[in-house]
Amino acid sequence: MKDIISVYDFSKSDFDELFELADKLRNMSTYPKILKEKTVALAFFEPSTRTYLSFNKAAINLGASTIGFSGEEGTSIAKGENLADTIRMLNNYADMIVIRHKFDGAAKFASEISEIPVINAGDGKHEHPTQTVIDFYTIYRNFKNIDGLTFGLMGDLRYARVVNSFLRALTRFKPKKVYLISPPQLSARKEILEELNYPYREVIDYNEVIEEIDVLYVTRIQKERFPDESEYEKVKESYVVDMNLVSKMKKDAIILHALPRVNEISREVDKTPQAKYFEQASYAVPVRMAIFHKIVGE
């Protein structure tokens, strides 16, 4: 596997292998140095905390040195250097590139120029494939399976790249049902829905379906996406996970969030058995270590 640009780059067996490898890596006190004498470039044209640091830690754990930036300030990009030239430059300095960019398709564009492997760490509102592997690994850890579960994705389903990757990755499995819970202004994109091979239903009021859901994936309602602020005011409180919502969920259901959150999950929910988003974040390093293994073929 040379590049990871989309979740479609993973087969069902790839997911299974990554889960198994992440399990092994989580339990190791020392790690195989499969990236010894290698350099990983972290080219984060958008600022990042969790993704940047977890990729950095994963690479170092496997013996690599890392170079890179998070945000364009202080780089030649801020002076106007184009993406193609930056990627060509990084090919001279590194053995692998992890890229995050604000434009859809930037990771694929980079992979077409690059002679070294490229991993997509989020491109615009397109995809975030390695986050989805973390999401699915969290589900696997809690349910031992992904097939047969009922999913609810709630909040901004139009602009959140994690949603696109999540929905696409589910085509590799057999979910019982998927509920897409959002205001009409932020409903999932038609082109994404046309790719799905499993039953789904679009819902405005979570109360209609919350009791059925095994996995609730929450994203932030983005005020800046609404052309009319009054429309945002109408829906902003409708998609907050609070204790009232949790009380209606199955006892063994789980709540996921890619983080960072703003106010879409109340702090009081953090201590409930359903809250798994910090556990989810803790899997970022072992899962991304497993992804590096997949890239180098070891």
From Swiss-Prot:
Record carries keyword Transferase: yes
GO molecular function, one term: amino acid binding
Transferase found in the keyword field: yes
Superkingdom: Archaea
Residues the entry annotates as binding carbamoyl phosphate: R50, T51, R100, H128, Q131, L259, P260
Record-linked SUPFAM superfamilies: Aspartate/ornithine carbamoyltransferase (SSF53671)
Binding-site list for L-aspartate: K79, R161, R220
Example GO biological process: 'de novo' pyrimidine nucleobase biosynthetic process
Known EC number: 2.1.3.2
Keywords assigned by UniProt, alphabetized: Pyrimidine biosynthesis, Transferase
Catalytic reaction(s) noted: carbamoyl phosphate + L-aspartate = N-carbamoyl-L-aspartate + phosphate + H(+)
Class in the EC hierarchy, top level: transferase
InterPro entries hit by this protein: Asp/Orn_carbamoyltranf_P-bd, Asp/Orn_carbamoylTrfase, Asp/Orn_carbamoylTrfase_sf, Asp_carbamoyltransf, Asp_carbamoyltransf_Asp/Orn-bd
Pathway this chain belongs to: Pyrimidine metabolism; UMP biosynthesis via de novo pathway; (S)-dihydroorotate from bicarbonate: step 2/3
Protein's job: Catalyzes the condensation of carbamoyl phosphate and aspartate to form carbamoyl aspartate and inorganic phosphate, the committed step in the de novo pyrimidine nucleotide biosynthesis pathway.
Oligomeric and partner information: Heterooligomer of catalytic and regulatory chains.
Family: Belongs to the aspartate/ornithine carbamoyltransferase superfamily. ATCase family.
NCBIfam families assigned: asp_carb_tr, PRK00856.1
PANTHER family assigned: ASPARTATE CARBAMOYLTRANSFERASE (PTHR45753:SF6), ORNITHINE CARBAMOYLTRANSFERASE, MITOCHONDRIAL (PTHR45753)
HAMAP family listed in its UniProt record: Asp_carb_tr
Protein's name in the database: Aspartate carbamoyltransferase catalytic subunit
Species, as recorded: Sulfurisphaera tokodaii (strain DSM 16993 / JCM 10545 / NBRC 100140 / 7) (Sulfolobus tokodaii)
